[in-house]
């Protein structure tokens, strides 16, 4: 089972392939991450490693968070995440993981929080068709009927209506690694990833 790392979205740009075609790419700052905890099949009923990312000032963490890290002489780390693995004997507490675990041409999945767009109507949120814009119509961007009458006398759960758009945990799959900079821990992926510049992402 492949492990993952945490990273930060730096932004997007484009590169040109051998044929001169422009390829949109996303630049990520990945790691370095520290192994902060190990879960074993015998003790926890599953094998996993917990990694920490982004060193911060100690006063920005709670005492339980600091204690969890200080037990293993680890620096204050803001973000913790667990990844399931087949076996944990190849990892050690306080081991440092960086972008070198990825390979050129590897297919990865990236998870993060999508850009929040606030309260949105049905046209923007669900791609509803607009009503007539002329000839006396007053139904331009209204959602229309949201259900039947006295039977069932309720609006069904999951009905597409206006509401908050974006700001959800999203995973983008099948992204190709097109460049690696191991000296600066920079990963370049073909395509786009969730969130805005500065978002914390999980690359797996």
Curated annotation (Swiss-Prot):
One cellular component (GO) term of this entry: cytosolic large ribosomal subunit
Pfam family, one: Ribosomal_L3
Keywords: Chloroplast, Plastid, Ribonucleoprotein, Ribosomal protein, RNA-binding, rRNA-binding
GO molecular-function terms, A-Z: rRNA binding; structural constituent of ribosome
Presence of keyword Cell cycle: no
One GO BP annotation of this record: translation
Localisation per UniProt entry: Plastid, Chloroplast
Record InterPro entries: Ribosomal_uL3, Ribosomal_uL3_bac/org-type, Transl_B-barrel_sf
Region of interest called Disordered, as start-end residue ranges on this chain: 126-155
Domain of life: Eukaryota
PANTHER family: 50S RIBOSOMAL PROTEIN L3 (PTHR11229), LARGE RIBOSOMAL SUBUNIT PROTEIN UL3C (PTHR11229:SF16)
Role of this protein: One of the primary rRNA binding proteins, it binds directly near the 3'-end of the 23S rRNA, where it nucleates assembly of the 50S subunit.
Quaternary state and interactors: Part of the 50S ribosomal subunit.
Protein family according to the UniProt entry: Belongs to the universal ribosomal protein uL3 family.
NCBIfam families: L3_bact
Official protein name in the record: Large ribosomal subunit protein uL3c
Gene assigned in the entry: rpl3
């Amino acid at each position: 089972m492949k492990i993952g790392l945490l990273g930060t979205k730096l932004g997007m740009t484009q590169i040109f392939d051998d044929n001169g075609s422009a390829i949109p790419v996303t630049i990520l700052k990945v790691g370095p991450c520290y192994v902060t905890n190990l879960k074993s099949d015998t003790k926890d009923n599953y094998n996993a490693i917990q990694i920490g990312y982004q060193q911060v000032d100690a006063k920005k963490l709670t005492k339980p968070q600091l204690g969890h890290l200080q037990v293993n002489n680890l620096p204050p780390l803001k973000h913790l995440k667990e990844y399931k693995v087949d076996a944990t004997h190849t990892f050690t507490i306080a081991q440092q993981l960086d972008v070198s675990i990825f390979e050129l041409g590897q297919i990865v999945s990236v998870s993060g929080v999508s850009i929040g767009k606030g309260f949105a109507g049905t046209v923007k949120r669900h791609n509803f068709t607009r009503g007539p814009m002329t000839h006396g119509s007053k139904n331009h961007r209204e959602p229309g009927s949201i259900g039947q009458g006295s039977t069932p006398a309720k609006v069904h759960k999951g009905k597409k209506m206006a509401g908050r758009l974006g700001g959800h945990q999203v995973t983008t799959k099948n992204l190709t690694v097109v460049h690696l900079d191991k000296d600066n821990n920079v990963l370049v992926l073909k395509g786009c990833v969730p969130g805005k510049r500065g978002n914390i992402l999980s690359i797996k």
